[in-house]
Amino acid sequence: MMSRETLRALVEASHKRGKLAVVHVGTEQQARDAINASADGPAHMFTGEMAGADFGKFAASHSVFVIPTLATLYSTCGKSGAPALLEDPYLKSFIRPEGRVLLEQPWPYAKASCTGTATAMKELAEARVRILAGTDAPMPGTTYGASLHDELVLLVRTGLTPLQALQAATSVPARAFHLEDRGLIRAGMRADLVLVKGEPTRDIQATRHIIAVWKRGIRFQR
């Protein structure tokens, strides 16, 4: 366990070098310690019961972002979205064999509850804290690419609107990491695009029905 003094020193050293300080946390207290140490944001939400009822307001008052990695946390609670991904008609044919192995891999130890996770996420959403989509792949029950679609569903289930979930995977992380040339569809921006069938601003699962992908303006053949 890192001391608070060491944590603060590391955050300060990172900022002096012009770098963001994103801190791995596993409990509510660790998240609060990271935020109090002036970290730019904690990575991972926490499980179990919450000690306080003001985490969302606390995070908002420090202008941090949060990368909850719900896909992994819900896997630790025995509520993995992996089985649904493996059978999803739009995704399953694109999951590589090594990705399938990861999705089928059970978590080595299960936590009792994700109640605290859901409660904290609701508070963060109500306080309009910046949420960044991330999965923590390749942890058990997750894989690169496909698990992000599960993450978006969980973000909506725990308090974000579908539009906010889409922003959590596009414009919000681009701004948080100072990537000014991407994250939006706008003249002069990088043409990193995904075309889907449906209306993901109403039904977040529409992101799974991918028609085409472009990176730097070049269309990928699937």
Where in this protein do the model-derived segments appear?
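Active-site neighborhoods of metal-dependent hydrolases
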Residues: 45-158
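Divalent metal-coordination and catalytic microenvironments
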Residues: 14, 24, 42, 66, ...
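Short aromatic-centered micro-motifs
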Residues: 213
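Generic structural signal for hydrophobic
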Residues: 10, 14, 34-37, 59, ...
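Histidine/acidic-residue-rich, glycine-tolerant segments that coordinate divalent metal ions
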Residues: 1-34, 44-46, 50
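Short glycine/serine/threonine/alanine-rich loop segments
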Residues: 18-20, 39, 64, 129, ...
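Acidic, glycine-enriched loop/beta-strand segments at the rims
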Residues: 143, 161-166, 175-210
